[in-house]
Amino acid sequence: VKVRVGNVEHDLRVEAAFSVPRLGFQDNFFCAFQSLLPDGIQPTKFTGPFWGQCMDRVLLDMMDRTDWILCTDFDSVYEADTVQRLLTAAMVSGYDAVAPMQCKRDEGIPMFTPEGHFEIGRVEIAPSWFEATIQPVDSAHFGCTLLRSSALKRTKTPWFVGTPAEDGHWGDAPEGQRQRVEEDIAFWKTWKNSGNTLGICPQIAIGHAELMFTWPGRDLKAVYQYPTEYWKAGGRRPAAAWGSAEHAEASAK
């Protein structure tokens, strides 16, 4: 991949790593194609039920023959120039890992932890923070993230090992108890503890594909519902949806 920074053109060896299930989203595949093919970036995937194990194997497979590895999830959506912009940010900043902004499914919160804010909860960030090309963070995601191969080589192993909550289980622990650590977050902790840097690019953002239920509303306008909200409500449609119990009660008055 040729990346121009100022008057200097860099020729980088870049490949893309995928950990995928057997079935996936076509929108993701085609946006990946439009980003990877023009730059000749070869994608490699490992398939299996355990995301961390597949990602470990695909990273190990390409680590020695690349300068950078693009890790991308099978539910990410991005534009054709996203990878080039990330590579430019990586070369300008000198960071070992560079990720774009991405929101978490269901909750809609940004998927990164500002540096020094692990396990603090809600964090307020000044608007000026988002004006920078890159900002240091303690965790990010793998939606469309660049890893410097030389930094990956010095990262301690194992790479992807999560830990359960204080009670030994994987559910949400009560407040005040140690929460579970997912395998992707465990990777970033190990990455940083191995002396590597991690940055988020506030000026670059990608989408996150997720299933939504669309109901006709009581005013015949669309009402949207997350699947988790549907099941938490006992398999019930939203109150604002046509045919809901609340709709029936209002119609009976």
Predicted regions and their residues:
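Conserved catalytic core of nucleotide-sugar-dependent glycosyltransferases
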Residues: E79-H169
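N-proximal low-complexity "stem/linker" segments adjacent to membrane-targeting elements
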Residues: V1-G48, Q53
